[in-house]
């Protein structure tokens, strides 16, 4: 029987996954990314590794995990171990700059953006953009470190307090005015849309994580909806081009044009809490079915 390992860091996000695997009778090894060691002379690897490493790990004191995972994925793929959300996908998870480049390569509209690695250069990078702007750590998640600046003068006054994150790079984007005050999140698994959520922020903050474990921090309201057809097509193309097996892709409908504008890609995508009530089914069951099919195919190869 093919062996499965799940590589992860957050202590709570993946309980539903492990419970669903157990219900399905699929055994797995749990690899904790913040306490990781692996032998370069190792010859017996799992047949399938499911990468569930998050870009927000550094904000929980686990920045060392992000760099070790990058090396582990390179080793696994070099040994021809099958990886769900492998090295190419992970590079997108930990770089918002690369996400913007992927959107552009895919022909998906994205906000005008720039990047910088110091407060002084951040101010310089913004001079070609139209305010207001959003400044985000390049490697981050769950809204950590995200700030809005309404003028260049405000940014100049507060640039020294901007969070650059674990790689010391910040992304700055023109703010996109939303047509309905909402953003939309398309969940994709194995080249197909699982569901789409309309996300309404309730109050301040930018933590739009939909999972149970984020409920105390995220004040967003999630409802199921149908994505714009052009947004769905673009999101699927982005996932294919980025070699991403599972992800959540977010867009806003620009009130000036009515067009979808893509601004975030979550390779580590948490399913919505209370999924049966919100989307009508348990996405973990479909995820485990997918993993089961991958394992079955690998068992036949063995």
Predicted segment positions?
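Extreme N-terminal starter segment of soluble prokaryotic enzymes
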Residues: 1-5
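Conserved N-proximal alpha/beta basic substrate-recognition cap immediately N-terminal to
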Residues: 9-112
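Short glycine-rich anion-binding loops that position phosphate/pyrophosphate groups of nucleotides
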Residues: 54-57, 138-140, 268
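Rossmann-like NAD(P)H-binding beta-loop-alpha module
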Residues: 105-131
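Protein kinase-like catalytic core scaffold
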Residues: 133, 194-195, 247, 259-263
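Phosphate-binding site of ATP-dependent enzymes
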Residues: 144-241
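Glycine-rich phosphate/pyrophosphate-binding beta-alpha loops
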Residues: 202, 266-280
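A long amphipathic alpha-helix within ATP-dependent nucleotide-binding catalytic cores
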Residues: 207-260, 283-301
């Amino acid at each position: 029987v093919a062996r499965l390992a799940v590589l992860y860091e957050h202590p709570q996000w993946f309980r539903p996954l492990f419970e669903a695997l157990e219900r399905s009778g699929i055994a797995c090894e749990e690899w904790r990314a913040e306490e990781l060691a692996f032998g370069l002379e190792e010859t017996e690897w799992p047949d399938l590794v499911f990468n569930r490493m998050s870009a927000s790990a550094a904000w929980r004191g686990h920045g060392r995990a992000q760099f070790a995972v990058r090396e582990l994925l390179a080793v696994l793929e070099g040994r021809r171990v099958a990886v769900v959300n492998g090295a190419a996908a992970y590079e997108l998870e930990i770089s918002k700059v690369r996400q913007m480049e992927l959107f552009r390569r895919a022909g998906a509209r994205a906000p005008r953006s720039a990047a910088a690695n110091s407060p002084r250069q951040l101010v310089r990078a913004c001079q070609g953009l139209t305010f207001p702007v959003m400044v985000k750590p390049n490697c981050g998640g769950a809204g950590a470190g995200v700030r809005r600046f309404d003028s260049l003068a405000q940014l100049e006054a507060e640039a020294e307090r901007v969070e650059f994150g674990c790689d010391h790079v910040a992304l700055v984007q023109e703010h996109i005015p939303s047509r309905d005050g909402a953003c939309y999140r398309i969940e994709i698994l194995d080249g197909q849309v699982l569901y789409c959520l309309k996300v309404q922020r309730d109050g301040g903050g930018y933590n739009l994580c939909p999972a149970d474990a984020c409920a105390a921090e995220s004040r967003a309201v999630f409802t199921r909806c149908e994505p714009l057809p052009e947004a769905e097509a673009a999101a699927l193309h982005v996932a294919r081009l980025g070699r991403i097996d599972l992800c959540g892709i977010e867009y806003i409908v620009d009130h000036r044009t009515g067009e979808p504008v893509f601004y975030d890609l979550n390779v580590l995508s948490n399913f919505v809490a209370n999924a049966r009530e919100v989307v009508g089914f348990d996405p973990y069951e479909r995820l485990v079915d997918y993993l089961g099919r991958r394992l079955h195919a690998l068992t036949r190869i063995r």
